[in-house]
UniProtKB/Swiss-Prot annotation:
Mg(2+) binds at S172, T192. GO terms for biological process: ribosome biogenesis. Its main location: cytoplasm. The gene is obg. Its cofactor is Mg(2+). It comes from Pediococcus pentosaceus (strain ATCC 25745 / CCUG 21536 / LMG 10740 / 183-1w). InterPro entries: G_OBG, GTP-bd, GTP-bd_Obg/CgtA, GTP-bd_prot_GTP1/OBG_C_sf, GTP1-OBG_CS, GTP1_OBG_dom, GTP1_OBG_dom_sf, OBG_GTPase. This is GTPase Obg. An essential GTPase which binds GTP, GDP and possibly (p)ppGpp with moderate affinity, with high nucleotide exchange rates and a fairly low GTP hydrolysis rate. Plays a role in control of the cell cycle, stress response, ribosome biogenesis and in those bacteria that undergo differentiation, in morphogenesis control. Residues 353-430 form the OCT domain.
Length: 430
């Protein structure tokens, strides 16, 4: 089964907790703080594996979690950091944030890596909080939570050449003749339900990868038939061989079909019309094909949009014209840069950071309880060691520094009111 779109959940490892500990040795009465820091949690990394061709491995596994860092230890020893969780994906995988739809990365090169979730840093042990005013602090931090994100992985087949055309025009037959690929072939629509890849090797040592893009129909750009699933793969090719049936055995007019597919390309992505396109009239071994070809060529040359397109008629059965077509395709590929691909429209080329002056929290009164929410305050709370009073006092100072106390007073909170952050409930003190 060819799988080209999946949704997964990834969770990076949490940082290990720092600890409160003191040096206790004979003849060292004032050993001081000795609590070590926690180790860093593992990142979640996507890596291109040249041996993969589909996203099939994700069909039954959708959740991935990296290991957390180890807790700090006595004698100022830092906990062990965890290794990254590396997930293999095929080349041509586009990674999107499922919540925002933003493209996080485009993985095309063998061995290319992308960190999709960063592991949390280790919490600090009490030795980090020692100061002249507080030489023996009982303060430590829990590890920072690792990032968690829902992702959509979308595979776009990487090929130099794409075979384009209506169903049953002979794309699979051509692929089987010029390469060692063995696609399913039959005289009915949508025999090809997945992109098939093959390698074309010329006698002069040149080679290129060719993809049999499943047949398109009118309305494909709106998802009619199997349109969306197929059109995404066209974007990755550098040259399109547009196959047109010259057998005269169908009711459709060859030029009308040719024009319809170009209209679907335009609707799906106008930049696809700038892709180099070679017209390949097929089934030239059948009676009446020569007359159909003459009529078709005349219509093409009369349309200024297609007048400059090269035409290479072939027969995959008799092999007539195949050698010229393959050689010309290789020549055209040499004229087009390797990186001449359509960029994903919303892909970020640089990492940007947004700074906002708005509050990092919200406060809402629910059933006489002041509920505080916000990514920053919740993260600070998770990193607070609630088993030590000094750590709780430090968290209270952080809340005041963020303006939460002032906001509670402004909203009408009174002494003794219940305040909740996540599952932790405490009293508001004036």
């Amino acid at each position: 089964m060819f799988v080209d779109q999946v949704k997964i959940n990834v969770k990076a490892g949490n940082g290990g907790n720092g600890i409160v500990a003191f040096r206790r040795e004979k003849y060292v009465p004032n050993g001081g703080p000795a609590g070590g820091d926690g180790g860093r949690g593992g990142n979640v990394v996507l890596k291109v594996d040249p041996g993969l061709r589909t996203l099939m491995d994700f069909r039954y596994r959708h959740k991935f979690k990296a290991d957390s860092g180890k807790n700090g230890m006595n004698k100022q020893m830092t906990g062990r950091s965890s290794q990254d969780l590396v997930i293999s994906v095929p080349g041509g995988t586009i990674v999107r944030d499922l919540t925002t739809g933003r493209v996080i990365g485009d993985l095309t090169d063998n061995g290319q890596e992308l960190v999709v979730a960063k592991g949390g840093r280790g919490g600090r042990g009490n030795m980090r909080f020692a100061s002249p005013r507080n030489p023996a602090p009982e303060i430590s931090e829990n590890g920072e939570p690792g990032e968690e994100i829902e992702l959509q992985l979308e595979l776009k087949v990487l090929a130099d050449v794409g075979l384009l055309g209506f169903p049953s025009v002979g794309k699979s037959t051509l692929l089987s003749v010029v390469t060692s690929a063995k696609p399913k072939i039959a005289e009915y629509h949508f025999t090809t339900l997945v992109p098939n890849l093959g390698m074309v090797q010329l006698d002069d040592g040149r080679d290129f990868v060719i993809a049999d893009i499943p047949g398109l129909i009118e309305g494909a750009s709106q998802g009619v038939g199997l349109g969306f699933e197929f059109l995404r793969h066209v974007e990755r090719t550098r040259v399109l061989l547009h196959l047109v049936d010259m057998s005269g055995m169908t009711e459709e007019d060859p030029f009308t079909n040719f024009r319809q597919i170009n209209e679907e390309l335009k609707k799906y992505n106008p930049e696809l019309l700038e892709r180099r396109q070679i017209i390949v009239p097929t089934k030239m071994d059948l009676p009446g094909s020569d007359e159909e070809l003459k009529k078709f060529e005349k219509q093409v040359r009369a349309d200024e949009r297609y007048a400059d397109f090269e035409i290479f008629p072939i027969s995959s059965i008799t092999h007539n014209g195949l050698e010229k077509l393959v050689a010309r395709t290789a020549d055209v590929l040499e004229e087009i840069p390797q990186h001449s691909l359509i960029a994903t429209s919303d892909e970020e080329t640089e990492k940007t950071y947004e700074f906002s002056s708005e509050k990092d929290f919200t406060i809402e009164n629910i059933d006489d309880v002041w509920v505080i929410e916000g990514e920053k305050i919740e993260k600070l709370f998770k990193m607070t060691d609630t088993t030590h009073d000094e750590s709780l006092l430090r968290f209270a100072r952080q809340m005041r520094g963020m303006g939460i106390d002032d906001e509670l007073r402004r909203l009408g909170a009174r002494n003794g009111d219940s305040v909740q952050i996540l599952d932790f409930v405490f009293e508001f003190v004036e």
